A protein has these predicted regions:
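Phosphate-bearing ligand-interacting subdomains
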Residues: 2-5, 13-18, 22-33, 95, ...
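Glycine-rich phosphate-binding loop signature in dinucleotide/nucleotide-binding domains
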Residues: 7-11, 43
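Short amphipathic alpha-helix with an adjacent loop that forms part of the alpha/beta core around
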Residues: 2-8, 81-87, 142-145
Length: 169
């Protein structure tokens, strides 16, 4: 924003963000900062967000599953109680920062006694070098070496999830 303020000669500017435009994206912070600068009279700008392919939608399509009945969360640069989400939900879509997040998740699931989960992971979805991995918790050690370093979108399925109480009483 400070660059735009210092260079008013630039009247059409683009900012590119990787990932989903509305799912834990820096695009939202940028939009908010531009709106605040407009309100203060520092800038005069219009913001248009042009989405790409949603990683959750892409992974669900590749796997042939719906995602309207899933919980969406992220541990890519943030803290989330994934164990609790997986314990209480059959499907959890999750953004991960890399291989270390897989190791941490598997260890947390084991510590919590959640052993019967299937994890499907998409890497570089929609790109020519896209990869899909599916494994159960007990197969993790053998699959870890196949995982390239990078950001992942995962579907964690737990058929043994606890029944959720949807209404009081």
């Amino acid at each position: 924003i400070s660059y735009l303020i210092e260079h008013p000669q630039y009247t059409k500017v683009a900012a590119a963000f990787s990932g989903d435009s509305g799912f834990y994206s820096g695009a939202q912070s940028m939009k908010k900062a531009l709106e605040e600068a407009n309100e203060k009279g520092i800038l005069k700008s219009e913001t248009t967000i042009l989405p790409g392919i949603s990683s959750v939608s892409a992974l669900a399509a590749r796997l042939g599953v719906s995602w309207n009945d899933a919980v969406l969360a992220s541990i890519h640069g943030r803290r989330t109680n994934v164990v609790n989400l997986v314990r209480k939900n059959t499907k959890v879509f999750l953004l991960l920062s890399g291989k270390n997040d897989f190791e941490m998740l598997v260890n947390k699931f084991r510590e919590a006694g959640i052993n019967n989960v299937k994890i499907s992971a998409g890497y570089r979805l929609s790109y020519p070098d896209e990869k899909l991995f599916t494994f159960y918790l007990d197969e993790f050690e053998t699959k870890l070496f196949d995982l390239p370093e990078g950001v992942y979108t995962c579907l964690i399925e737990n058929e043994d999830c606890e029944e959720q109480i949807l209404t009081p009483g």
